[in-house]
Structure formats: C-alpha cells, structure tokens
C-alpha cells in the first residue's frame, strides 16, 4: 500500500489516476491517500477480500517526516500500520521518501536546472 498525502481539492483525481495506473501494472499494489476519496478506510475491505496476510506500507512522499513516521508507521491508534495490524495483517513499513531514491532526485534536479536556466534567459 503506497500512502500519498492527497488533497480535498480538484487535484485529488490525479491521485486516483495514479492508483489506477499502478493497479494495471501490478494488481497487488494500491495507492491510498490521507485526504481524498481513496483512503485507507476505503481500501481496507478490498485488502481483506484478497488472499494474504502481509501488507507493506510505502510512503509516496518526498521526504520522511511526520506523515511517514506517525501517520503511516507510528504506534498510535490512528496510524495506518496500527489500523492494518488491528485488521489482522502483518505490516511492514518502508521509511524512505521519494527523494531518497535516485530517480526522483534526478528528476527534480533536472527541473531545477531548467528553472534556473529560464531565469538567466
């Protein structure tokens, strides 16, 4: 389960499209948001209907911070990890943000280079 921040605004459809695209690539990977239409609450019935008892949590967030450490992987009763464990799943959390990997870091640096070049023009 990939945890995205989400939004209550019109951009929430982008998260839904992202989740649909990911599901076409791998039906065992889900995208849910902290805010929006597709949340952990809406995903839990689907997870329960699938065979398997292990869930991996992955943050779709730039950096690891409060949302990853508390909202996703924390021990509190509202954390996704805690809620999944209460639902009977064995849960593991990956504590690396998108910027920790080379792909997104390189993508952002290329965009930054373009923006700086445009300022010089």
Describe these PLM feature segments.
Residues 1-121:
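Extended amphipathic ligand-handling, pore-lining, and cofactor/metal-binding catalytic surfaces
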